[in-house]
Amino acid sequence: MKIAIVGAAGRMGRMLVKMAKESKDLEVAAEIDVAEGFAREWPMDTEAVIDFSFHSAVPPSIAKAAEQGIPYVIGTTGLSPEEQTAVDAAARRIPVVQSGNYSLGVNLLLNLVKIAAKTLGPEYDVEVVEMHHKHKKDAPSGTALMLAKSAADGRGVAFDDVAVYGRKGMVGERPQGEIAIHALRGGSVVGDHTVMFAGDVERVEITHKAQSREAFAAGALRAAQWAAGRKPGIYTMRDVLGL
Ligand SMILES: NC(=O)c1ccc[n+]([C@@H]2O[C@H](COP(=O)([O-])OP(=O)(O)OC[C@H]3O[C@@H](n4cnc5c(N)ncnc54)[C@H](O)[C@@H]3O)[C@@H](O)[C@H]2O)c1
């Protein structure tokens, strides 16, 4: 299967190219990046595009894939609402897999967090803490947002009504039902996430630590193979994994 990697010069892109070249089922049709020495376009016989680049790069790239009928896998995070609308429009014409995290472990965690939130209820305060390397550009991480949304789902509340991003100053006592997200940055951390359920007499913590970008790249390559031949629509990594 011929795949194109968008953002091929980046941390994730380099890992994707390396793993795709090692796979007997995949062929790298194009390594696309704005960096010098990289391609700007994929060939017409490309069978899937995997995008781990920059939020503003996604709309023009996915629009081109939609015109050509090529499935698209989005790993890039931090999309604005307008950019997300462009993705949704493309998904009416091609299969699109979009996930803030392609690792098996985090996708399992999403289900565990939903169950925990439902079981423990709003008496347990939910705080999501994430840490990433100092080069990460968006905050909080797409994964932290997905985890916080899973907690909101488990409680049956609308995430936007209860979300809080960090705290500073005289914020007052913590109201019940809030779901707060905190982003730490430093060093070379690949991606750590903890969801805390803090009760009055006990605390439950669910943690995932990615040790290598291989965890994300393997999932994205699997998603590209899964997407080929699907009906147009927007899918998540949970669909790919059947979770
Ligand atoms: N979903 C996941 O599992 C997952 C995992 C890790 C990272 N990410 C996300 O993937 C993205 C990339 O992460 P990274 O750590 O590899 O970043 P990075 O900065 O190392 O790489 C991004 C690459 O994209 C390139 N790029 C920028 N604009 C472009 C354009 N218009 N066309 C083509 N290429 C362009 C840059 O030149 C760079 O080489 C980020 O949004 C990050 O949050 C997602």
Predicted feature locations:
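Rossmann-fold dehydrogenase core element
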Residues: 71, 86-103, 121-126
